[in-house]
Amino acid sequence: MLRDGNEGMSTIPGFNQIQFEGFCRFMDQGLTEELYKFPKIEDTDQEIEFQLFVETYQLVEPLIKERDAVYESLTYSSEFYISAGLIWKTSRDMQEQTIFLGNIPLMNSLGTSIVNGIYRIVINQILQSPGIYYRSELDHNGISVYTGTIISDWGGRLELEIDKKARIWARVSRKQKISILVLSSAMGSNLREILENVCYPEIFLSFLTDKEKKKIGSKENAILEFYQQFACVGGDPVFSESLCKELQKKFFQQKCELGKIGRRNMNRRLRLDISQNNTFLLPRDILAAADHLIGMKFGMGTLDDMNHLKNKRIRSVADLIQDQLGLALVRLENMIRGTIGGALRHKLIPSPQNLVTSTPLTSTYESFFGLHPLSQVLDRTNPLTQIVHGRKLSYLGPGGLTGRTASFRIRDIHPSHYGRICPIDTSEGINVGLIGSLAIHAKIGRGGSLESPFYEISQRSKGARMLYLSPGKDEYYMVAAGNPLALNQGLQEEQVVPARYRQEFLTIAWEQVHLRSIFSFQYFSIGASLIPFIEHNDANRALMSSNMQRQAVPLSRSEKCIVGTGLERQAALDSGVLAIAEHEGKVIYTDTDKILLSGNGDTLNIPLVMYQRSNKNTCMHQKPQVQRGKYIKKGQILAYGAATIGGELALGKNVLVAYMPWEGYNFEDAVLISERLVYEDIYTSFHIRKYEIQTHVTSQGPERVTREIPHLEAHLLRNLDKNGIVMLGSWVETGEILVGKLTPQMVKESSYAPEDRLLRAILGIQVSTSKETCLKLPIGGRGRVIDVRWIQKRVGSSYNPETIRVYILQKREIKVGDKVAGRHGNKGIISKILPRQDMPYLQDGRPVDMVFNPLGVPSRMNVGQIFECSLGLAGGLLDRHYRIAPFDERYEQEASRKLVFSELYQASKQTATPWVFEPEYPGKSRIFDGRTGDPFEQPVIIGKPYILKLIHQVDDKIHGRSSGHYALVTQQPLRGRAKQGGQRVGEMEVWALEGFGVAYILQEMLTYKSDHIRARQEVLGTTIIGGAIPNPEDAPESFRLLVRELRSLALELNHFFVSEKTFKIKRKEA
């Protein structure tokens, strides 16, 4: 965080800073750390030695630009070179060469990586910090059982338990445990050393029986006992070196490597002074942990809160990428060892370049970015989504939790989250509470701790010093919560203020306060901070709003919100969608494609984004805002991006809304809208779809892209150019050909049609031996072709086919079935589009644009929408914009209501419209029915809230099935739009049909129109030619499946068919 010149004031940190700092930490420290771990490699005869010279490494600037990497499906990466030496020990000769280790993907200005043409982002993970933790649980008798859990750097756990006889056990597996004396002896301590290093030797001696003495009589005996319990081996195993190696690999390496963070935590918790470089568990640690456990048993010491953030660590992008580099270097080491041995066996002279290949590093990073759960495709629905995605914190992933096993306690909000993790912004569903979002001012400190800033209040000096505190440290201070000084230093402090101390809330005198918060948004994430009047909303609805703002579609014409929070500008600046001047200068040329700047004798070319597709098919576009000949300064905005206007985030529109029921069309959150929103393109958005086809070389020859496609109607090919590819600017409809392609196939003489054989025999005409495999426009894809990319085969690549991509732009107006939402969790589906003359209208004659259901407010307790609605109306009339900080009630009671009513009153005075503020029912107004002209019985709340159009659009969801695939087992239609699936008649549908008594329809739906294989084909035929549908003569497939399942349970079930004519029983086999 930066400090301003004003004392006690600060600026908001960059929202992408977390990602940048992590990647820079990897480049500065992590890269060299892993290279220094790479060992010197010798052959088996120790004649040759291979080593890397770490100081000589270099990263080369990428050869391609980011935009080209996206279009050509390449990785935006840097080539990694380092010097390596091969030393012959007999002659002391050394051969040194610069070798190519591989490609390391780089981070771009958005804080993301481009891998195979896809924007990917690595999110941060929260893990249990390595160290020791003491807990108490009740057994089945209601007696407290104390345990100490040692967590290793790799996530392995070693549990120490104390029973009611004060005997201490180490649990080596789920079912087996050994005495603490056996464990200490196996780690190298004898009995005398054990008794000298513990605080309670008499307790250790109390459970030292003769049998126990024999087990710890020597280190070998202790290891044998340990191995017997660990591996559950019976009999009398014999001590050997292989037995020790197995224990080392399977137990000690997984459960006893603490790492630097674990060593620091262990020293602090057990008050030890072991060196930080000693990162393995020692006998001294085990004995000190046992002493503490005995103390817990007798009521001394404090238990640990496993969910406290001081006991967690953040695994950032730096840690994850560094781990992958270490993994790649281990693979490279094994490969070099094998290659050296092979070369010497065949009496070849190796060189560093022959020994090293780039495959381990390149493939490791590609698999990491492509397959790792914490590497995700960047969500680019709108600018806000891009920022928020990189600030996520996940408990899931390797070494973490799973959505099905995580307890409620882990998902819950903890007091230590204050100012570090947003208490509101989390995902809905099974992962609720497991995927959080960083608070605005939080940062990742040394050792992976989450730090939050505070102002230190000093009685000596009037100045406020800002400091970052890790989760455990702020508990020892009195922290003032929600004090006005956080916004205005000139305000006189109250005598008594609410404060936080050791996870409790107190009321104390101002003189006792040590720290105060620095900003009113300090506790929230970016998404939650963009909700005005958030303090008047239920937290569940604020959570929904935080998520839904990320689903808002950029509109064709953006509009600033009348009521905001003040963070809109910062969010737009950090999102990367704005073009910002990096140098001052003069604009010498500008168009929709680029801006040319002249300054300091150089000409700078700034390319603009034109109709670029995001991975959610939304349109990313930049509009230049500077004119030729104008002088600009560094940091000035040159072009606005998608969903931004005036340098601020603009996700929706300010529309006139009435809260009232209307003929049942807004029942259950449905929304009634005016046709003005359609005809004036208020909620029109552009979407870009990508369609691609590849040409392969088959066994019969290469596939051809051509315009000459036989047996296809001419109108389907009318948009193709001479090469067989659709022309730019063409309007294409469903079913039309985008790319013409023929695939060769082997055709036997006998498979020709008779007329084809006749043509060949008489005229010698060669009939086509190719089948058409053209790229056709699927259903719902109509639009304008805006770009075509033909990506040729890479040089020297035999496997990479040619790819042709066609980009089609769609213009979508708002329609029935689309989803809209406000910023307070108030969401709904468009149910009807009314003519504007039928909409309710105000006293000045203006028809409203939307009608919301008023019953959606009281039960959901999101009253903030009412404040925003009324203040938006006042702002629209006064031509003002408001930026409201949250929790304004701390200044005075009813501050929000007073502000809204005063602005409404001022608007009614200045615009001479007394109906805007009527004292009898302030905030409400009498409005009229557009169909009859009569006033409605009750006054209605009207206003101008900010309403978003979400990406859940009916064009993407509507689906019908005429024919398609069936499931192999049940012979019923598949599920889902992507599989061309259909609806099935389930038990609830059967109940509905039974309720209406429609026996024949029920029979059809359950038999020959459903899963009766032969009968459903006959139904199709009789429907086409007309006639009676024949009755099936055997059982449907679902009944046969039931019979088979019962047979698998050893229940024989036969079914019989009774003929209508003879009434004779005919037995049918299932």
Swiss-Prot record:
Keywords attached to this entry: Chloroplast, DNA-directed RNA polymerase, Nucleotidyltransferase, Plastid, Transcription, Transferase
Protein's cellular compartments: Plastid, Chloroplast
Gene Ontology cellular-component annotations: chloroplast; DNA-directed RNA polymerase complex; mitochondrion
GO molecular function, one term: ribonucleoside binding
One Pfam family in the UniProt entry: RNA_pol_Rpb2_6
Gene Ontology biological-process entries: DNA-templated transcription
Top-level enzyme category: transferase
EC number of this enzyme: 2.7.7.6
Assembly, per entry: In plastids the minimal PEP RNA polymerase catalytic core is composed of four subunits: alpha, beta, beta', and beta''. When a (nuclear-encoded) sigma factor is associated with the core the holoenzyme is formed, which can initiate transcription.
Family membership noted in the UniProt record: Belongs to the RNA polymerase beta chain family.
Protein name: DNA-directed RNA polymerase subunit beta
Species of provenance: Daucus carota (Wild carrot)
